[in-house]
């Protein structure tokens, strides 16, 4: 049975829209619909001439087919209908020359490899890691100690891929950091800035690197204050000249002796007066066998801008890169043959190493001198840091600014200006050293051992499959719309900042919360959190139309039927927009406001009705043609009849609006008054209703079964509640609630999204805990006469979840008493909530969008196919063949592998772990003995668990204490919602302990006074000597009159104390 959908009621064309799931369910081979691959230049000129010869300069569906057939470009009926709908972007069923050429251009744009490299997030998006330097002064030197140099010989260079398997964390690959300060302290750190040890040095430390390849000589490059550059080469074999010699702990070498060749292991080379100023930076390129040296020329009156800021020396040839004020730092990208320089003039220049006369690009934007530049060739990005600690990221090819990062200004005190920088090319980290150690991730590699990558930079809200273009469209809370090719895993188009809002002069991205396609699936409709709606021609990222419901009211659901658009959300009602040519920009129609809370979800049955549900559990069925409600339910009491009745104020408003509409007023004055009055009435709170208030159960998702008729005995609407149950209703006028079933197996979980296949045989659900469940609903809530026989062996071949196990798993235990619907698959697909789920009919592929930023593809049986946006190779898929192969070994998502249960492992891997072992006579003796041992183990385990264990359970090694004679019966208080356990405890009163007498020695120590043993010391300074002579006075006599303890009155004690202090002051 084919699915036919007319484009418009006013259209005379007989275009029928058939999907690949219609009568033409399979093709002999995949036919390409991309005309840009077929049409040559001569054919294109003939097509242009044919368009010009037409009377109205545009052709219809039949005329275009005739023109293409004259050029030997033929299609079958189904493929040509799809092609015509793709070309006809104006939806008038007439194609002009501009539309035809635009379609050819879109074909080339889809194959543009630059669209694959555009990043979803900023290059520096993660927070920096800050540590104390643990040095007494600021760090003056920062180096990386590695076993292998960053420069790799040419024969060992491989293609760089931006993902890793976690091997860079090892010390052999990432090395360790070494920091040094002016007081001579050196500290060693791991690659993740964990301290290892501390050392001290009294001399200047120079750094050098060894090449593991003994054929390549190591080079120590020295630049001095006079502008000279010296190169010292030596062989790294057996540590070269740095071998330890007996009897000599330190070997001192004089440069003149090295030049004279007295040390044969050194090969020196000098470049005298290479620069006229101090050498600021040197580098030797192993690939180009060239030396780069730079210097700063700040004396503009002396050099007048004609200074060679950087010089490249290749053998005896010199290339001068003339830059005003010279060069402070540079970076050589050998894979691209470019040099990036930065200096005091605040400009970043990109040079071709073979064209030193003029830079390829000049990047402006810094307000201070450049202190560091480095390049990421695999990411095509240039990073620059200025004196004011501002980091800017540039695109290497387009020469545009991508990001300005200013967090270093906040983390580092403004008085710290001399900072030390080092870029770790292997870990892709920038380390800034001063009083603190700060590590910044710069486009970090994806750890494929932890995750497969992300589809969006924020949670995915909606995923849709377009049957016309055969692609997947994902929308996220990052305000991105991304078009994916699910058959190759490529990203076709990315649209950023789709919904925006200006707040205090700053443009803020608004989250996309709802989306759908038009009936012919040519355009995309999106709704945002601020109530805005946009219609997109998502093939060229052009906004066709802007709409809006009430301001700052989130759009939770959008429905697009023929000639009408129905958005709804937190405004408690349905708003209807026209989609007819000529009436697009009229005022929207507001449906009656019967809801008393925010609308959370909605769905439509073409030609019959619409169902809406709210946060408070209200369900209303509407007539699609008239927009009038005909039934109302509450999920708390679904069998109770609720009358559809407006309040008195709403009825008064309706009569008033009709009277104003019929009154003849000039212009649009009456229309404006009607809108004003409507806004004042609809914005009021409706707390006076006696139903639907304070209901704790909310509706999370609704689903219409399109193939089920509108009868009393057919359950056609599925309602998902936050309690984990799914209620089934009939949308007939006299229908209602039929049955409910539990759709989750964990406490607190609930179904957030649902979808079905084309024939409504299976129900696919995604839960808040990340579980994907598949239900067989073909015989669920249908009359007995329409039920069919279910072949369970066939289902077990497709769904491994149904195969028997030794123990009943948790997902099966939850539905063991539930006859219908039949749970055929259950597994954990995401770590976080699944916000959207959809299904592709012919290849039987499920794709889910989750709160964990990813969109994943699965087979109907539960095998994992991949994540959109992954860096790993993509599985071979086609829209004309069923996905999944029983002989193929499928892998698991790395994040799910760590938390997967036995059921998830079995379903995703497709391997039954527990199988019965049978012994065959043809096996060797050793295999028979091993199989016999395994069989005996399984048999003993089943004997142990099939019947109660005999006493004593714990053996003879432990005996339980005997019970008391009196059996204490505890009566629990169950009147409240919880049981207070502490009220059931028996509390014994405490008794005072007998206090032992205090020993005489302790009593005597307690009564002692330290003043009895205190003897003051007099100190007098002898002027003649340099030391202080301490004179000890004679022991003070014990005078009872001066003892304050013998004085009875407080006043007398105060007088004696004052007298004693005055005497001490006079003596001193």
Swiss-Prot record:
WD repeats, residue ranges: 155-199, 201-242, 322-361, 365-404, 455-494, 507-546, 594-634, 746-785, 829-868
Pfam families xref list: WD40 (PF00400)
UniProt xrefs under SUPFAM superfamilies: EF-hand, WD40 repeat-like
Cysteine pairs bridged by disulfides in the record: none
Region span, Disordered: 657-687, 1026-1068
Protein keywords: Repeat, WD repeat
Biased composition (Basic and acidic residues): 1039-1056
Matches recorded under InterPro entries: EF-hand-dom_pair, WD-EF-hand_domain, WD40/YVTN_repeat-like_dom_sf, WD40_repeat_dom_sf, WD40_rpt
Keyword check for Repeat: yes
Protein name per the record: WD repeat-containing protein on Y chromosome
